[in-house]
Amino acid sequence: MANAKKKKMTFMESLKAQFSTKSLVLIPIAVGINLIGGTLCSTLKLPLFLDMIGTIVIACLSGPWVSALCGLLTNVFLALVANPVYLPYSLVSIFCGLVTGYMVKAGLFKKIWGVILTWLACSLSITFSASLITIFVYGGATGVTGTSVVTATLIAATKDIVVSVFSSSMLENLIDKAIAFAIAYVIVKKIPRRFLSQYASDATDDDDED
């Protein structure tokens, strides 16, 4: 009966359900987590980003569109407090939130293999979108994090900007998102069930626990 009701839920009803009071409280917390990770990597020039941990967590707890908003707000704040370079990458963060959120909604966070599949899908989609922005907006490198050093090294070796940007972005995102998904998975699993919304309980609890 519950599944039948969920299938009949319209997009607007689903959107309204995602933006619950709990979700509105979680958004600034998730954005804060993203800002800490992103600012730290930017300041230390690390070849990582770590600015989507909160986005992944809230995708599990509240849904894809709340996660997309979290990603957008994160990049807007990073552009204001760290570097304007982050602003165009808002699209990447939104994409990450939607991809992760819908895969979580499909129940893929219930098992480790599903988490791995979600990580790979998110990493690949982010690599494609971020690489296009890096190439067409910034000419191949941004200089914000240590990732630009990797890209510059590959460009010097291959003499091909497109191949270099996509290759470095793929490597960096696989590593970065592996860390982000691992941390997010641990956080979500550590949250007591009574504090989870019905969405989070349905999307992340193991089937054998129901």
Model-assigned labels for residue ranges:
Residues A2-L61, W65-V76, P84-Y86:
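Hydrophobic transmembrane alpha-helices
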Residues G71-A79, L98-Y102, A106, D205-D210:
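Extended, non-catalytic scaffold segments that flank or surround catalytic motifs
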Residues A2-I36, P88-G139, Y185-K189:
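Short helix-perturbing small/polar motifs within transmembrane alpha-helices
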Residues T43-F49, Y86-P88, K110-D210:
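Membrane-embedded alpha-helical hairpins and interfacial helices in multi-pass inner-membrane proteins
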Residues P64-L69, L73, G107-W113, I161:
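Membrane-helix interface segments
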Residues D51, T55, V92-G97, A180:
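Hydrophobic core segments of transmembrane alpha-helices in multi-pass, intramembrane catalytic enzymes
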Residues T74-V81, V137, A141:
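Regular secondary-structure segments
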